[in-house]
């Protein structure tokens, strides 16, 4: 989207699963996790790399590390975190992640993100917590959450956690300097909060997903795809684009393209 217009879009021809994560790289390529696989495509929609999950497994979150590596979490029994070289297709690093319900892949993970320190924040949906791991899989920090969906590390070292209750900014000590609940903006109903992002202004953008199988914008009047609020929770901007020419559909994830290159991150020694 640029200036309120859709300038590029992609419909997965396979269409096998829900898209839960998508990242645009600085070269215009897009890496996305689509439940039963991970794919990177060019701006002209050619597949650069693709991975299909084995039966009984799912992938809902993936991120680039440099131009040649991808980190993703594969739900299943066992659930694993992998770093793959997409040039050689070799798995260069793998860690087993503990889950509460190993035989229920769908509800294990939806989102993870790398920190500036080269660690990984993981939202454990089925274990009701957010955990920070180092490169070797050692747990460095954790915080309880109610079926956490999104986790966003902040430059100040704090973490934005999005769960069933709302959004909380959590410090390393476990303090909560800021929080948001759907009741804070009653004019804009939320059905399922997904993720949150802190803007340079200090405002926070929160996105909302409509379950297209059982609910629609028509029977959820006022539903938004995203909302921007100030630290005082005043509404700055609302995204409600359900109809042509900019029919965006349910919003699982957002990316602000003016920020740093998505691939300029590291996981331990891997850049």
Model regions: which residues?
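Histidine-/acidic-rich catalytic cores in large beta-rich domains
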Residues: 1-271
């Amino acid at each position: 989207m640029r200036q309120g217009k859709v300038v590029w879009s992609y419909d997965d021809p396979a269409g096998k699963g829900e898209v839960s994560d998508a990242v645009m790289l600085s070269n215009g390529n897009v890496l996305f996790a689509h439940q039963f696989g991970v794919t990177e495509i060019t701006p002209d929609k050619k597949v650069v790399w693709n991975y299909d999950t084995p039966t009984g497994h799912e992938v809902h979150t993936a991120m680039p590390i440099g131009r040649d590596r991808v980190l993703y979490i594969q739900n299943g029994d066992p659930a694993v975190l992998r770093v793959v070289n997409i040039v050689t297709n070799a798995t260069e690093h793998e860690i087993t992640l503990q889950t509460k319900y190993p035989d229920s892949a769908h509800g294990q993970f939806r989102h993870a993100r790398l920190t500036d320190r080269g660690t990984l924040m993981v939202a454990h949906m089925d274990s009701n917590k957010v955990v920070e791991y180092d490169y070797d899989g050692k747990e460095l920090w954790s915080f309880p959450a109610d079926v956490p969906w999104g986790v966003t590390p902040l430059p100040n070292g704090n973490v934005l956690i999005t769960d069933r209750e709302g959004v909380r900014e959590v410090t390393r000590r476990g303090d909560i300097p800021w929080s948001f609940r759907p009741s804070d903006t009653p004019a804009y109903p939320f059905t399922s909060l997904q993720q949150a992002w802190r803007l340079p202004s200090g405002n926070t953008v929160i996105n909302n997903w409509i379950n297209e199988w059982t609910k629609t914008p028509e029977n959820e009047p006022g539903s938004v795809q995203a909302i921007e609020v100030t630290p005082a929770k005043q509404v700055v901007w609302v995204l409600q684009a359900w109809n042509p020419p900019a029919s965006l559909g349910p919003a699982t994830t957002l990316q602000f393209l003016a920020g740093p290159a998505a691939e300029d991150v590291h996981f331990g020694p891997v850049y």
